């Protein structure tokens, strides 16, 4: 199995939703890892620069046509691109990932996209509220009873989260990937959730 984590970035993607996960993959609290267990790779519709909501431009490692068939995880980063026709090109990518038992993460509108195409019908899940999942999903979303009102949920290799849950999303994926020990992942989560001053006892 490849050790690459593939991040799907559509035009106007939400850059902040990548940060906690990708940083923990590539570094520890002191420096870049010399031999990381996984490697971050950006995937976009083409090899052209893809722009974030905030205006940052990312040069992708792969396009939809050149991305590998084997990888460790597929992560759908939220943003406004999921409401556009280009998002439909991601349907077979996700379908293949689920069929192969790959780890799939989807946050914010990425989770709504999953609902729209019936990918959440066999798992417990969350997202930007049940109403949005039903609005996006229509008749294809048949599992509202599986919705959990939580920041992030992991079930059967699928992790979903709402757009405010970037840290919780990262935590669930890091645990599923076994990127570090559960204790170190919890430490990373608490440090970023609580903040240095609170954890160090300083005012």
Model regions and ranges:
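Active-site-adjacent pocket-lining segments in enzyme domains
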Residues: 2-14, 20, 27-46, 56, ...
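A short, charged, and often flexible helix/loop element on the N-terminal side
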Residues: 53
């Amino acid at each position: 199995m490849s050790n690459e984590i593939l991040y799907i970035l559509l035009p106007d993607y939400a850059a902040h939703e990548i940060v906690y996960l990708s940083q923990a993959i590539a570094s520890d609290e002191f420096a870049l890892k010399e031999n990381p267990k996984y490697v971050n790779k950006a995937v976009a519709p083409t090899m052209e620069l893809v722009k974030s909501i905030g205006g940052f431009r990312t040069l992708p490692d792969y396009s939809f046509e050149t991305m590998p068939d084997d990888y460790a995880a597929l992560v759908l980063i939220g943003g406004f691109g999921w409401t556009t026709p280009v998002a439909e090109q991601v349907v077979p990518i996700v379908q293949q990932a689920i069929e192969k038992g790959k780890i799939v993460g989807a946050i914010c509108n990425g989770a709504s996209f999953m609902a729209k195409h019936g990918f959440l019908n066999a798992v417990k899940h969350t997202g930007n509220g049940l109403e949005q999942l039903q609005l996006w999903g229509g008749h294809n979303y048949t599992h509202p009873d599986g919705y959990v009102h939580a920041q992030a949920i992991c079930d059967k290799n699928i992790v979903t989260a709402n757009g405010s849950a970037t840290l919780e999303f990262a935590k669930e994926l890091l645990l599923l990937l076994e990127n570090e020990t559960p204790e170190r992942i919890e430490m990373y989560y608490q440090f970023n959730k609580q903040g240095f001053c609170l954890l160090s006892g300083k005012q």
